[in-house]
Amino acid sequence: MITLKEALNKSENELKEIKTLLRQRVKENIELNAYIGEINESGSGVPILIKDNINVKGWEITCASKILKGYVSPYNASVITKLHENKMCAFGRANMDEFAMGSTTESSCYGRVKNPLDTSRVPGGSSGGSAAAVAAGLAIASLGSDTGGSIRQPAGFCGCVGLKPSYGRVSRYGLIAYSSSLDQIGPITQNVEDAALLLDAISGYDKQDSTSANLPSLNTFKDLDPNARYKVAILKDFLKDATPQIQEAYNHTIKILESMGHTIVEKSMLDTRYHISAYYIICTAEASSNLARFDGIRYGTRSESKNLKDVYLNTRSAYFGEEVKRRILLGSFVLSSGYYDAYYLKAQQVRKKICADYESIFNECDSILLPIAPSVAPKFGSTHSSLEMYLSDIYTIGVNLAGLPALCMPVSKDKNGLSIGMQFIGAKFKEQNILNIAYGLEKEINN
């Protein structure tokens, strides 16, 4: 597939031919289930696939949930407006985990997405459709959202580049919220250059988002420097949960970075089990609040009932999926008066400790190298409990708790041809550093 960098230099007539080709490819690869429904486009320009939780004016937006079936967005998310300002357009809806809750893209009301590298395996989640489409050549690039690894993990499983920007770098206006203090929109692309281009296009201050950082526009693409050298921290104590092949790929990546001239520094952090506990308390608490609005009254699907209480009860029971209901219940529990101090307050204290740990490392280092997941993409049905699925996020969620930028890129393949991804984590608003390291490593691996 043509890269974003190449596509931006094409004429509108040439882009129309590319869009026709993409439509044909999607039809030919319908079994991947990466796209949802008919392929719409929001205007002229380079086509960018959009996750089904980002508003595009006049398009149905469902968050892959039955409860929002038929709801048509009345406005554009800020990132869509920015695409239009940068010679790009929204093109098609990407399948996802329902309300972005999941790590496998199996909870969608449209059916599960398959990994193009091995269709018996998950593509990762929750932006599984976005990553599968880019990996299969069904999209030039795509936009996903990352609450606890939902851009990076599917990018790692499918063999793409996924970039989660710093919290506040990209406007969340028009993103249907899952966990407001953790959510962030970002690009999934074929290579590091394209990730920088798409990040530059969608980033910037937005007065419509109160959490948007008032910072100058980015020029990460123009400033890409594969020869820049950095201090990279490694966290070997985190590897105890990883499979031998992930550990081997991690150590091999360290050797390549050292041979390139980067300085490797061994560091330690709060155990990942604290990351998991704090994350799932905070994100479910925020989700229970954010999803309270989906009640069958103002928009979306409604269950006909005899009284108001039954409208709420029947609508939410019938049209929310099992994983969404589980997280709403957990969030409501930790926010209840008897348990708020014991769980939610403690989780926020742990979050502060995690932020302090990262800050301490970034006082001495420029980046942290970590795996994207403890294993390669698992087979469908091999995850037997929600807890098992939650544990697959151990390497990604700390980044969201601290609001940091992180970039996942493929570094190798296992014996079955499955992608192994590693991530570079940066200090807040230091996207340039991780892009430079990844760009240099990408060139080194490709050579």
Swiss-Prot record:
The keyword Amino-acid biosynthesis does not apply. One of its GO terms (cellular component) is glutamyl-tRNA(Gln) amidotransferase complex. It comes from the Bacteria. It is an enzyme of class 6 (ligase). Belongs to the amidase family. GatA subfamily. Keywords: ATP-binding, Ligase, Nucleotide-binding, Protein biosynthesis. It catalyses: L-glutamyl-tRNA(Gln) + L-glutamine + ATP + H2O = L-glutaminyl-tRNA(Gln) + L-glutamate + ADP + phosphate + H(+). Allows the formation of correctly charged Gln-tRNA(Gln) through the transamidation of misacylated Glu-tRNA(Gln) in organisms which lack glutaminyl-tRNA synthetase. The reaction takes place in the presence of glutamine and ATP through an activated gamma-phospho-Glu-tRNA(Gln). Heterotrimer of A, B and C subunits. The active site is at residues 51, 126, 150. GO terms for molecular function: ATP binding; glutaminyl-tRNA synthase (glutamine-hydrolyzing) activity. The keyword ATP-binding applies. Its EC number is 6.3.5.7. PANTHER family: GLUTAMYL-TRNA(GLN) AMIDOTRANSFERASE SUBUNIT A, TRANSAMIDASE. GO terms for biological process: translation. Gene3D superfamilies: Amidase signature (AS) domain. HAMAP family: GatA (MF_00120). This is Glutamyl-tRNA(Gln) amidotransferase subunit A.
